[in-house]
Amino acid sequence: MTYEGGRLILISGTSHLHRADRGLNVGMESQSDAGQVRFIEAQTAPTRFARGWHCLGLIRDFDDGNPHAVNAFGQKLVVFRGGDGTINVLDSYCRHMGGDLSNGEVKGDAIACPFHDWRWGGDGRCKQVPYAKRTPRLARTVTWTTLEQDGMLFVWNDPEHNQPVPEVTIPRIEGATSDDWTDWHWYTTVVNTNCREIIDNVVDMAHFYYIHGSLPTHFKNIFEGHMATQYMNSAGRPDLGGTEGARMLGTTSVASYWGPSFMIDDLTYHYEHADHHTVLINCHYPIDANSFVLQYGIIVKKSADLPDDLAMETAIALGDFVKLGFEQDVAIWRNKARIDNPLLVEEDGPVYQLRRWYQQFYVDVADVQPDMVDRFEFELDTTRPYAAWLKEVEANIAAGAGSVP
């Protein structure tokens, strides 16, 4: 247990109550009252990484003919496309003398180590040692199963080293490779916290109002198997923003996690004169237990009102709007405490059920329990929060406010 800034944090197990500032009594409860105080419990973030498909980014960013380093799952990987057109992911350190393959060169179908030119194929086997008579039979390194789909590169992570089953395949995104939609407008950032923080947002309706300036009118969750879905409708906030441009009336969103780290959000923005149909990707992969790479991208459906150039401009504008939202989240994550025992009200949603669903990806397949994967459905009654928030919005308008409360 540690004490930080007036907050006791139980790291693991149980502990006696200790205070470095025992001499201070302002705002502090007595020892006899300590049993009535709610303490934050927080175990160390798991060092095991989630089983499932993880998106490393857009394929186009790996397609320049060079090897690329990716720090993921507590290690360093190298990504390269061989001369045969296959994209490969290997452990980045050569099994010969530890050279970094990401600093090497693609030669034919192999990646050549910059140290002694050992050539490694996409199957993990050393294909050639140019200066040697023979290639050692034990010259084999770790490989990662890959998937190229809808312009994105995925890798499969499994601590048990099993191959992915068809049931967990990432679904194809209608429009991602269609001329009727724009190309991906994509963002990447590093977040220095455990990736469970972003998962909690699936059930957190209230933060959309307080952090993102939305006004939710409908909110529902369904968890089943390896999927967790958030259904949300929101109204516009007339107390926010300027008067230039078309006024946004609200949004309709169906956002599903397909496994532990890849969310597809069918998101429609409703404006006064038209609707903009988009697909938003929200995905991440862990660097280590306490940091992850957050990526998000958007495509926009073209229409008579949104021809090619204007549609791409809209994708960029909406993408920048989404970027602002994620930056608001990151600012919270950067400063908040990890908490395993959140104190909740009904309107906070099924946080514990969501975390139980999420736990399935951190245990062996044989240890997955029915309550991790059985269908769970919860619809929030938005009557009370909507009334409270609408009252705030009206007060902001009356006061001439123009910022998020």
PLM feature segments, named:
Residues 42-50, 213:
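Non-catalytic accessory segments flanking enzyme active sites
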Residues 45-46, 69, 145-147, 284-286, ...:
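A general structural signal for short secondary-structure junctions and capping/turn motifs
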Residues 86, 161-405:
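C-terminal catalytic domain of Rieske-type non-heme iron oxygenases
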Residues 12, 16, 24-26, 32, ...:
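Rieske [2Fe-2S] iron-sulfur-binding domain
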Residues 7, 19-22:
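Basic polycationic patches enriched in arginine
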Residues 50-53, 65, 150, 184-186, ...:
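Sequence-level motif detector for i,i+2 pairs with an aromatic at +2
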Residues 50, 140, 147-149, 278, ...:
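A short, structural micro-pattern
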